[in-house]
């Protein structure tokens, strides 16, 4: 895969989520009734959320895979990418609620009925939500930590990647969509920087592997 393609793939998913979090019409809602009312007032934004979510589903996990084998092997890499992948693969479960909100509103159902549909989402979606939060946050923190320890990124960029997802969590708890956009954009920048910095797998020879192993303390 060409370097430009790897960079684009690594950044596409987090950037799609950054935009999604910025335009989400019910960002500060405290329940599904408020969320349904917000979607009813701005159905176009919710439609955009679903399209951005679709892009994220298609690109988040492949973006991880595109850079995984370019990074130093070891338990830290295995743990980091496993957690991040599990989290990203749970994303469709979160979008299930958005789909219900959009469909119900688009069909002209009352806000109360749409809220009841969202409240009745299948338990698997709730499990996905429960898994998504800790796994993707910890996974990205560990990827940033690996990049910092291995000196694969400038320290400032590595720390930006490390704190990006805890910052996302803080923005959700504080109801600050602009800060959330910054957080996910920081993840996108860190991942793209990694993709631009790391040597292509197919071109890595003995010397390249030795450099990475040495950087990782091997």
Residue ranges and their predicted role:
Residues 1-218:
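Hydrophobic, aromatic-enriched alpha-helical segments typical of multi-pass transmembrane helices
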């Amino acid at each position: 895969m060409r370097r430009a393609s790897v960079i684009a793939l690594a950044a596409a998913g987090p950037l799609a989520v950054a935009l999604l979090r910025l335009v989400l019409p019910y960002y500060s809602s405290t329940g599904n009734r408020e969320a349904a009312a917000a979607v009813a007032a701005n159905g176009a934004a919710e439609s955009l959320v679903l399209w951005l979510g679709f892009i994220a589903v298609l690109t988040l996990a492949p973006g991880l895979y595109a850079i995984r084998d370019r990074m130093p092997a070891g338990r830290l890499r295995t743990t980091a990418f496993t957690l991040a992948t599990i989290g990203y693969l749970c994303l469709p479960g979160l979008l299930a609620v958005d789909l219900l909100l959009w469909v119900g509103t688009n069909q002209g159902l009352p806000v109360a009925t749409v809220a009841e549909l969202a409240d009745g989402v299948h338990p698997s979606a709730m499990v996905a939500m429960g898994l998504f939060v800790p796994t993707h946050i910890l996974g990205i923190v560990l990827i940033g930590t690996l990049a910092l320890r291995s000196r694969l990124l400038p320290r400032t960029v590595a720390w930006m990647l490390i704190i990006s997802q805890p910052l996302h969590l803080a923005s959700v708890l504080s109801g600050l969509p602009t800060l959330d956009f910054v957080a996910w954009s920081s993840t996108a920048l860190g991942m793209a920087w990694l993709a631009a910095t790391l040597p292509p797998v197919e071109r890595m020879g003995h010397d390249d592997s030795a450099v990475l192993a040495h950087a990782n303390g091997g």
